[in-house]
């Protein structure tokens, strides 16, 4: 008789696993405190997923948009909450206008402080 051993995975690990399973090869990123767990998981999969470090969120989203436009595969940008998401909206707008495949993932505040004006909190549903 075998025992089922539960394996607890972090959200970041699950995200990296799913992106890898969907053959994502590049993520254009401005590292941020709100998604350190995901960054750790991407580093663990550095042979599968290459993190391309941008110096500004608008640059990351524009790189993702250009990647999508040039390859036909969704370009993926990952930025932090608040100002990071606001800056990244430039590339999202271009992708929307040009019908370019692009995905923007934004780190966010913890659920327990959401809708309580937490540091750099933005209502993304309204914003985007």
What annotation goes with each model-predicted range?
Residues 2-128:
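N-terminal alpha/beta PP-like core and its mobile active-site loop of ThDP/TPP-dependent enzymes
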């Amino acid at each position: 008789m075998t025992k089922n051993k539960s394996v607890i995975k972090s959200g970041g690990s699950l995200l990296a696993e799913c992106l890898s399973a969907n053959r994502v090869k590049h993520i254009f990123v401005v590292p941020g405190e709100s998604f350190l767990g995901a960054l750790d998981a991407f580093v663990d999969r550095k042979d599968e997923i290459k993190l391309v470090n941008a110096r500004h969120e608008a640059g990351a989203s524009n790189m993702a948009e250009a990647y999508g436009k040039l390859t036909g595969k969704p370009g993926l940008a990952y930025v932090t909450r608040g100002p990071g998401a606001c800056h990244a909206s430039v590339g999202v707008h271009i992708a929307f206008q040009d019908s370019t495949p692009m995905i923007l993932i934004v780190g966010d505040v913890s659920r327990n402080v959401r809708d309580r004006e937490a540091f750099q909190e933005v209502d993304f549903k309204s914003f985007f």
